[in-house]
Amino acid sequence: RQVMAGLCFNEDCHCANAADTRRCLQEEAEKIAENIILKLPKLRKTLSTDVQAAFDGDPAAANLGEVIDCYPAIKALTNYRLAHELVLENVPLIPRMIAEMAHSETGIDIHPAATIGTHFTIDHGTGVVIGATCVIGM
């Protein structure tokens, strides 16, 4: 439903009438949701490299569980990586909302259109801004 709600902000659908538009949007949203679900294993693997990078780079990190549960960068990167996949699927609005949720919680602002490679972390990230045109580690 959320993907479909986001698609409603896209003005590219030129269906003949409202019923056709709704059906068209629903079919597109289902296809996008399926594509995202198929990408989840790769997304999980990428996030695990981010967790490992945070652990390896921080001598204060006691264990991976602490990194996952307590490090704001992991929250920001998790939201970014999901939002980025939605950007790649041309979903409007929803990726920015997901990124803003992490920004308000962590102080780390990562635009979902930015390109960030694997094994990435941000230590003490409050105030960090990564813009839409930024390419890191690619």
Q: Can you name each region flagged by the protein language model?
A:
Residues 101-138:
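Structural signal for interior beta-strand "rungs" in well-ordered beta-sheet cores
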Residues 1-100:
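Terminal amphipathic alpha-helical/low-complexity segments used for targeting or macromolecular assembly
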